[in-house]
Amino acid sequence: MEVMKYEVVIKTDLKDRPKDHELSAALILADYFKSDVVFLRPQLDKTPDIDVNGMSWEIKSPKGNGKKTIDNNFRTARKQSLNIIMDLRRIKMHQSKAKARIDFFLSTPHHFKKVLIITKSNKIVEIL
C-alpha cells in the first residue's frame, strides 16, 4: 500500500515568505490533517497564515518565558483567525507551564473555534 504524501504550498514571494519554524510546523500539520497545507499570501497585516481543507489557521510560535507570553500571543492571534495553532517548540518556559497558561486563557471568555498545540516533541494536541 502506498503512503499518502501531502504538500506544503507557498503562495507568496520572497518578501513575505514563511519563516523556517512556520514551514516545519506546516509539515507537521500536513501529516496531522492528512491534507495539503497552503500558506496564504498576506493581504493586510492581520490575515491567517495557512489554509487546510478550506479552514484558515493562524500559527503562533512564542519564544518568551514571561507570565503574559501565551496571553499576548492569543490576543494577537484572535485578530487573525478563530483557529489557532500554538507551536511550543521555541518557547523558553516548560511545556507543562505553557499548557497551564493556555488552559487558563481558554477558561476565560474567548471566540476561538479550534486550538491546537504543537509540543516540543513535535506532537499535536487538540485543546479546543
Locate each region found by the language model.
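Conserved catalytic cores of phosphodiester-cleaving nucleases, focusing on short active-site segments
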Residues: 50-63
